């Protein structure tokens, strides 16, 4: 799925190459602004501070890893199972001059050795690949890797509550056969229950269903507009399959049969959590350096260096949409 080629994903993703639900502050917001907002909210929800260590599980093309290191001053260890993503991410890290803060590896997170070494862990829409049989192991690994009182961020798509998560539907059969082999969706109730069972206190749960519907709308429009380029990169059959996959999930989020949540949990420790009692710091008192507004005003020189490094990995430049398409 992820090794179809970086150039293919660049046709419909934002410049940060974030392949997960964005966070829209309005229906008029651009995909670029919404993805930056999402990255920044993750950092705020994890209460990241300079000098802390963040483990980015399923780091993808290193969008969150780079954002957290650049804007919040943390040291990041990112792991992925995709060689294409790793090559892209490492080129981006070099171009941004963040080699001293970010380490990216081709590694299964269960093989990360630094037990109790992380202040925070992020997992953004990787959990869908874990499978029901491995849920217990997943949460126990998160617990093992976190320091006492460390924070775990969990963003994942789920089925609507009250439905049997084990029983496949016609839609999920298509998705798991052709798009995400082995993928399984639990419910938000299962997520919160498992966090409690395996050593966590759930601190915050936020519904992102309508945000993902908007994200998929943007992805569909972008990929369809550049479908001829996609045919050349991945073939017509695969491109059409992706468009069907986007349409199915967009409809699922629109109807509410599929949902997505951001959940923040803390590794249990005796006494107070040490976190603020209200949400002001998440939504109103965010540090100036970590806002999407500031990020969008970054120097063009840095953006040019990043683009050049990315082009060296992908072997080509991103093409503009053809006129009239």
Where are these regions (language model features)?
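A short acidic, Gly/Pro-enriched loop at the edge of an enzyme's catalytic core
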Residues: 110-121
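Conserved SAM-binding loop
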Residues: 89-90
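Substrate-binding/catalytic lobe of Class I Rossmann-like enzymes that use SAM or dcSAM, i.e.
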Residues: 158-273
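Conserved SAM-binding loop of SAM-dependent methyltransferases across substrates and taxa
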Residues: 61-72
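Conserved Class I S-adenosyl-L-methionine-dependent methyltransferase catalytic core
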Residues: 1-45
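Conserved beta-strand signature within the Rossmann-like core of class I S-adenosyl-L-methionine
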Residues: 149-157
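Conserved class I S-adenosyl-L-methionine
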Residues: 50-58
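A short glycine-rich, Lys/Arg-flanked "PGG" loop and its adjoining helix->strand segment in the class I
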Residues: 136-148
């Amino acid at each position: 799925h992820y090794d179809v080629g970086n150039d293919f994903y660049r046709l419909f993703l934002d410049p940060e190459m974030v392949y997960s639900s964005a966070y829209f502050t309005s229906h008029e917001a651009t995909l670029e602004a919404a993805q930056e907002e999402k990255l920044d909210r993750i950092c705020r929800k994890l209460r990241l501070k300079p000098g802390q260590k963040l483990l980015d599980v399923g780091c993808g093309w290193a969008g969150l890893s780079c954002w957290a290191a650049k804007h919040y001053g943390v040291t990041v260890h990112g792991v992925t199972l995709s060689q294409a993503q790793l090559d892209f991410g490492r080129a981006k890290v070099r171009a941004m001059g963040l080699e001293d803060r970010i380490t990216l590896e081709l590694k299964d997170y269960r093989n990360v050795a630094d037990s109790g070494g992380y202040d925070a862990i992020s997992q953004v829409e990787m959990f869908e690949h874990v499978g029901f049989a491995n849920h217990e192991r997943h949460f126990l690994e998160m617990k093992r890797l976190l320091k006492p009182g460390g924070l775990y961020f969990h963003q994942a798509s789920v089925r609507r509550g009250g439905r049997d998560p084990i029983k496949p539907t016609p839609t999920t059969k298509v998705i798991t056969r052709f798009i995400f082999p082995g993928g399984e969706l639990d419910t938000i109730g299962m997520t919160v229950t498992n966090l409690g069972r395996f050593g966590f206190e759930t601190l915050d749960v936020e519904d992102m269903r309508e945000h993902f519907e908007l994200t998929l709308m943007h992805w569909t429009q972008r990929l369809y507009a550049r479908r001829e380029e996609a045919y050349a990169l991945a073939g017509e059959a695969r491109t059409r399959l992706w468009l069907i996959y986007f349409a199915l999930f967009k409809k699922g989020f629109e109807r509410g049969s599929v949902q997505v949540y951001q959940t923040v949990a803390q590794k249990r420790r005796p006494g107070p959590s040490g976190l603020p009692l209200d949400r002001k710091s998440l939504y109103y008192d965010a540090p100036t350096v970590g806002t999407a507004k500031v990020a969008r005003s970054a120097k063009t020189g840095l953006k040019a260096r990043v683009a050049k490094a990315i082009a060296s990995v992908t072997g080509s430049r991103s093409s503009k949409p053809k006129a009239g398409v």
